[in-house]
Amino acid sequence: MGKKLKYTKFQLRSNVVKPNICMSLTTDIAGEAKLKDLERQKKGDARTVVAIILGGGAGTRLFPLTKRRAKPAVPMGGAYRLIDVPMSNCINSGINKVYILTQFNSASLNRHIARAYNFGNGVTFESGYVEVLAATQTPGELGKRWFQGTAHAVRQFHWLFEDARSKDIEDVLILSGDHLYRMDYLHFVQSHRQSGADITISSLPIDDSRASDFGLMKIDDTGRVMSFSEKPKGDDLKAMAVDTTVLGLSPEEAKEKPYIASIGKVYVFKKDILLNLLRWRFPTANDFGSEIIPASTKEFCVKAYLFNDYWEDIGTIRSFFRANLALTEHPPRFSFYDATKPIYTSRRNLPPSAIDNSKIVDSIVSHGIFLTNCFVEHSVVGIRSRIGTNVHLKDTVMLGADYYETDAEIRSQLAEGKVPLGIGENTRIKDCIIDKNARIGKNVVIANSEGVQEADRSSEGFYMASGITVISKNSTIPDGTVI
């Protein structure tokens, strides 16, 4: 692909001057530009999209894991944090303009973002950016309040979309920071643009057994959202049944899954529409899902986008526990081991795991751990974990540690009757979440044999949530304890 530019001889005052350059070979710049434009139109231009990841509220349903951290900073899958999921989806989709809104317990989240997604040591973003926007107060009565909801949080930073850096932005992705799923956001945006929608909502087809647990949408034969119903039951539920073949399901699948649920806080807005809704149409609305979007169906074109794949809201201790253990299934419904669409996280430069005479069954074992003559069954073991001799770990999610203790420190603590990091010998643990830097002594039994569902035993270093024992971060469980 190229043109020859020929320089003809020319005459100046009867003197014939030969040019120094007789021929130049160049690329067909105009042709290449057209090809690039066609490719962007075909796939959707990621350069005109900005993503906003919501840091979430106080995370009370995930307490005590959110006692000292924001929901998106909660560790997941042995080596990741929940924020890595939407961040990686953005990277894999080619979207490199990202804002992250934070408010509660944001120190560890901010630190992780700085380490994992900066321009020097982590994932690079070329001409894009990743910026953490902490809750702040601004002049005016409304600006004196902290974030009151998803829409209020975005409204506080509406000026970003009027900034010169955002002049080419056409669409805004609104994303949650505490979901587990893998999505091509660019395909989502492309569908939004091709449909002519003002707002597009990511939706999940579901069957009768789960429909009452979700907010459902009623759509017409073009996929336009006509109405919403929050967790309907009985006749109200039956009234929300729709023909899901409209969104692309086969007739067989549509018969099994006749309901459309919003997966929550995964939206795409036209930028101008978003600004209009936040500043002028609904200036006091605090939430997208319960206020702005339902009200917008009457005036704007709101459409549903089919996402027929694994998705989990990590909003409770039970869902967090279940989603982690589901990673150990064969095959898992969600896997971090996808070479074409990897999940990124911070670089830790940890050594390989050291496993001595241990048995590991249906489990995930992260890097930098030490296992000695133990049995790990259907569990997730996080980074830098240390598990001692004759320990049996079953149905347990161990988040790992932030640092190592040296052999000398461990010997010194044992000599003084203290408990080192990790799990001591002859301990049995079942149905448990062990937060970071926990110290569990020798001959401990954690099994909730009495079936306690809820209990605050923070003075003893643990909680009971939905029947699951949660060992608090930095806590110590003494030798011989039975829970």
Swiss-Prot record:
GO CC annotation: amyloplast; chloroplast
GO MF entries: ATP binding; glucose-1-phosphate adenylyltransferase activity
Expressing tissues: Tubers.
Function: This protein plays a role in synthesis of starch. It catalyzes the synthesis of the activated glycosyl donor, ADP-glucose from Glc-1-P and ATP.
Entries under InterPro entries matching the protein: ADP-Glc_PPase, ADP_Glu_pyroP_CS, NTP_transferase_dom, Nucleotide-diphossugar_trans, Trimer_LpxA-like_sf
GO BP, one annotated term: starch biosynthetic process
Gene3D superfamilies to which the protein is assigned, alphabetical: Hexapeptide repeat proteins (2.160.10.10), Spore Coat Polysaccharide Biosynthesis Protein SpsA, Chain A (3.90.550.10)
Name under which the protein is recorded: Glucose-1-phosphate adenylyltransferase large subunit 3, chloroplastic/amyloplastic
UniProt keyword terms in alphabetical order: Allosteric enzyme, Amyloplast, ATP-binding, Chloroplast, Nucleotide-binding, Nucleotidyltransferase, Plastid, Starch biosynthesis, Transferase, Transit peptide
Top EC class of this enzyme: transferase
Lineage per the UniProt record: Eukaryota, Viridiplantae, Streptophyta, Embryophyta, Tracheophyta
Family, similarity comment: Belongs to the bacterial/plant glucose-1-phosphate adenylyltransferase family.
Primary localization: plastid
Pathway entry: Glycan biosynthesis; starch biosynthesis
SUPFAM superfamilies: Nucleotide-diphospho-sugar transferases (SSF53448), Trimeric LpxA-like enzymes (SSF51161)
Subcellular locations according to the entry: Plastid, Chloroplast; Plastid, Amyloplast
EC number: 2.7.7.27
Gene (UniProt): AGPS3
Mechanisms controlling activity: Activated by 3'phosphoglycerate, inhibited by orthophosphate. Allosteric regulation.
Catalytic activity entry: alpha-D-glucose 1-phosphate + ATP + H(+) = ADP-alpha-D-glucose + diphosphate
